[in-house]
Amino acid sequence: MYETRWTTNEEITIMADYWYRMASEMEETDGIPKPELHRVEEVKHLFVKESNLGNLMFRVAIDSNDNIVACAGGLIRTEYSYPLAEEQSLFGWVIAVYTLKNHRNNGLAYKLVDEICLWLKQKGAKRARLWSSSTGRRVYEDLGFKNMMDMSKPLS
């Protein structure tokens, strides 16, 4: 019923819309502040830039009518892998994982994230990270993602 594939260059900007939908739902479920609409344009430009540099790729699931119904992105970054690490290493970030509501519970997020992790590994990343909503946590745990020692405190 579904197929997965890489996005085309023309579809990269559509991924910013899916990112906005994901972020909006995180506001509803987890209280994460909903991004302002102007942020979508900034994210579009960022996605195009990083895609053109070869640092960002998206996998999408399409339905039988060739409509994009789910996506997941992979972003390569150089970062310190842990506090006080002497050298930076390649890290993969899984970003903008989103499935349209009427296509959920079909394993699409799992499949797309798994495919993105393979791409990140092929690009040289030693570890993949992501920020998860409470509703998506189980999918990522099933893929082998673990909680890290990150803590936060609102200061306002």
At which residue positions do the language-model features occur?
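Conserved N-terminal entry element of GNAT/NAT acetyltransferase domains
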Residues: M1-T13
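Conserved acetyl-CoA pyrophosphate-binding loop and the N-cap/start of the following alpha-helix
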Residues: H103-E115
